[in-house]
Amino acid sequence: MGKRPDIFRPGCFSANDATYGVLCDLGFIGGGVSIPGRIWLERFCVWSGAYPYAHFAHGAFRQCSGALPFVEIPLSVDLTTPLRYNPVGFHHHPDLRPGGVYSETDEVAYDRRQLLHGILQRTAADDPPIKTLVVDVHNDRDFTSGDSQAAKDLSAVLDGIEPECLALGWEVVPATYDEVIRHYSAVHGSSVQRQIKRSNAEPAGASDA
């Protein structure tokens, strides 16, 4: 590769409460480890209740924000849609991926533009400090053929982003993971450092119980 990787995404979004700490020890600065709401026990993937927007990862509990020097940028899912069962074997909130989990076509059909609308409307209501839209795209799909369902799904998402954002008064800013991670760290890193200093200053045995 020519350089040491510093951004991480696990297959199937598998993780446990030790994952973020290990990633930090290995030099990773951020990535997309979580998929809010998915429950897939066979893949060691449980993200029920996970914080759905960019945040610093937690060292003891993967589901919430914390103070680790790892910027987590979750996959965007439609939280306005109730948890549904996917026949591949998991429960989830639908996301914008083109095609299915392991196939060119959906296991369960979804209107990508409707999902996009739900995701952005929920983001507007929650108003997180940094608003991101993350789509899971697999490189084994055919995005060149007009007959490809994956290509149609991706086009529906891409064609819908600007009008949906304009309706909310937002400017669309294309960005890589690295750019978002470094921007988030620059803007919010000082508050995390203060939190770490406060924690280190607490007397032994202090508790919020």
Regions found by a protein language model. Name each.
Residues 1-6:
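Short, surface-exposed connector motifs at secondary-structure boundaries
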Residues 7, 11, 15, 145-149:
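Conserved aromatic-histidine-acidic binding/catalytic patches
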Residues 10-129:
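Active-site-adjacent pocket scaffolds in enzyme catalytic domains
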Residues 102-209:
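C-terminal domain-boundary segment and adjacent tail
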